Curated annotation (Swiss-Prot):
<comment type="subunit">
    <text>Myosin is a hexamer of 2 heavy chains and 4 light chains. Does not bind calcium.</text>
</comment>
<keyword id="KW-0597">Phosphoprotein</keyword>
<feature type="modified residue" description="Phosphothreonine">
    <location>
        <position position="82"/>
    </location>
</feature>
<dbReference type="GO" id="GO:0060048">
    <property type="term" value="P:cardiac muscle contraction"/>
</dbReference>
<keyword id="KW-0677">Repeat</keyword>
<protein>
    <recommendedName>
        <fullName>Myosin light chain 1/3, skeletal muscle isoform</fullName>
    </recommendedName>
</protein>
<dbReference type="InterPro" id="IPR002048">
    <property type="entry name" value="EF_hand_dom"/>
</dbReference>
<feature type="modified residue" description="N,N,N-trimethylalanine">
    <location>
        <position position="2"/>
    </location>
</feature>
<comment type="function">
    <text>Non-regulatory myosin light chain required for proper formation and/or maintenance of myofibers, and thus appropriate muscle function.</text>
</comment>
<keyword id="KW-0505">Motor protein</keyword>
<dbReference type="GO" id="GO:0006936">
    <property type="term" value="P:muscle contraction"/>
</dbReference>
<feature type="region of interest" description="Disordered">
    <location>
        <begin position="1"/>
        <end position="30"/>
    </location>
</feature>
<feature type="domain" description="EF-hand 3">
    <location>
        <begin position="157"/>
        <end position="189"/>
    </location>
</feature>
<feature type="modified residue" description="Phosphothreonine">
    <location>
        <position position="66"/>
    </location>
</feature>
<feature type="compositionally biased region" description="Pro residues">
    <location>
        <begin position="16"/>
        <end position="26"/>
    </location>
</feature>
<feature type="domain" description="EF-hand 2">
    <location>
        <begin position="122"/>
        <end position="157"/>
    </location>
</feature>
<feature type="domain" description="EF-hand 1">
    <location>
        <begin position="45"/>
        <end position="80"/>
    </location>
</feature>
Length: 189
């Protein structure tokens, strides 16, 4: 018998390299609002009223306000933008820029127009419906303590002083708040 040939077994194939991790999903780019492309549709009288309100927030006499004041002026003029909407119309500035950078009325006006053009703002029925969720007994009231908690901890959180100022005089002797009357009150302020 012939001696067996020394047959070498093929070397075991190296394990396949692990697949490269999938790239992290790209964050959707925030659409920037091109304020220069916004057509001002306000009447001259409205613009004068807006300028008067704008100047009430000018603390230095320069006819300018800080970026952090823009939301306050917008709300004082009857719009109801979220803080996120305000930051978006401002171009998403840093917190440092919010307090340091100033704008003139001519820069503010397109921002006011952009916010006014946004038809996605809640109205009376939307707010009542949102509060109805907390009406455990279905009697048109919510507990003041629960509403305080919600306003201070959910969504755009309010400071405790802001919550107290908002709810002042709204609670009945049982600590309940008629939420339809409350919504009418806050929408008229």
């Amino acid at each position: 018998m012939a001696p067996k040939k020394d047959v070498k077994k093929p070397a075991a194939a190296a394990p396949a390299p692990a697949p490269a991790p999938a790239p992290a999903p790209a964050k959707p780019k925030e659409e920037k609002i091109d304020l220069s492309a916004i057509k001002i549709e306000f009447s001259k009288e409205q613009q004068e009223e807006f300028k008067e309100a704008f100047l009430l927030f000018d603390r230095t006499g320069e006819c300018k306000i800080t970026l952090s004041q823009v939301g306050d002026v917008l709300r004082a003029l009857g719009t109801n933008p979220t803080n996120a909407e305000v930051k978006k119309v401002l171009g998403n500035p840093s917190n440092e820029e919010m307090n340091a950078k100033k704008i003139e009325f001519e820069q503010f006006l397109p921002m006011m127009q952009a916010i006014s053009n946004n038809k996605d703002q809640g109205g009376y029925e939307d707010f009542v419906e949102g509060l109805r969720v907390f009406d455990k007994e279905g009697n048109g009231t919510v507990m003041g303590a629960e509403l305080r908690h919600v306003l201070a901890t959910l969504g755009e959180k309010m400071k405790e002083e802001e919550v107290e100022a908002l709810l002042a005089g709204q609670e009945d002797s049982n600590g309940c708040i008629n939420y339809e009357a409350f919504v009418k009150h806050i929408m008229s302020v």
